[in-house]
Amino acid sequence: MRPLVCIALAGAIAGLWLHGAVAQTSPAVQPPSGTSEPAFTPLTTRWAFPNSDAVNAGTVSIITAPAGGAKSVFAADMARVLDEKDKLRILPILGKGPVQNVIDILYLKSVDMGLVATDVPEFYKIQYGSDITNRLRYIMKLYNDEIHIIAPTEIKTVFDLEGKRIEAPKDVGLYSAKAIFSRLKINVTYDSSHLNDDTGALQEVIDGKADAWIVGTAKVMPIARNLKNEGRRLHLVSIPYDQRLQDLYLPSEFTSDEYPNLIPPGEKVDTVAAGILLVVFNWPEKHERYQKVARFVDALFSRIDEFAKPPRHPKWKEASVSAVIPGWQRFKPAQDWIDRWHEQHLDAANPTSLARFKDFMTQQGHASLSQEELEKLYSQFLEWNRRAKN
């Protein structure tokens, strides 16, 4: 075929194609004959490009832990439930864990809040001799991290670890190990060389190179539950709720249903649990970031009941807006919200209820409690009762 003919044909084809394209983008497409449907008009409205100041004003970030654990899931849940387009947006950030999260909250400009365990300040006192709580404020307790210790069955309780070598990954186990063993005056040798690698650290115990492995994490932990414990050589070690631990931890337990490979059928193992707190830097009240977090707190507290329902993480049922954490000061907007709720609900529902609660506490030998302490306890009781009904 001659070149000029090819060019002519190509031009004709292009003309036909363009004619079809123009027809397809005409303002109105008429319906087929015999129908009564209205003509379709293509949408021509364009979106306004976001304003950078508005985007930043409504965005807060939360640093968590490696993907897959409860900490990262909790932040993702908050991002989904509380999203309000330009008004409020939560950016979850995968972090290393509670110890590094403190450093990131203090020094990373892009981090507004983070998840920190209640025993982390104790770790900083031991390691650095400094109190970090005067530079931080907690918003609320989110859930509990149970302390897991796996060791050979001849080690029955935590006290049997005297003089032993402990695998304690830095950001998931070392901080709890230091706090617990220091409080209980148990001398051990720590190996934290695996940092965040809790699987590699556990393998050291499986291979007989270490005597025990410790991590603080929400049960049920897949690594522990899926451990192939041939001959049931390993088990979960008991941690009694010793008085020396009670300002840092809550009592908890593991069951054979949770860890059938590490606990004999029908038995339970005592342990302790550290609260996981949502923590913010102690900003001045007039600071822009203080105001941003304050707006987030109002949204979170106002919708807290939504988190206790599926498909959210089941550990949300342990969340407590009003829990008082020893050694910590609460973020003022969070405390203000609780105080307002207290004024609206405590005596409004039943004017005699607080007085009756005070009588009950007196009968139980707690007559020395101040009015403020009574009101906080009563507030916690009401919240617990409300959650139990849900």
Regions found by a protein language model. Give the residues of each.
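Bacterial N-terminal signal peptides
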Residues: 7-17
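Immediate post-signal peptide segment of exported/extracytoplasmic ligand-binding proteins
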Residues: 26-62, 154-165
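Pocket-flanking alpha-helical
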Residues: 76-80, 91-132, 200-204, 220-227
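Ligand-binding clefts/hinges and TM-proximal coupling segments of bilobed small-molecule sensing domains
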Residues: 171-183, 252-326
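Pocket-lining segment of extracytoplasmic ligand-binding domains
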Residues: 118-119, 128, 186-288
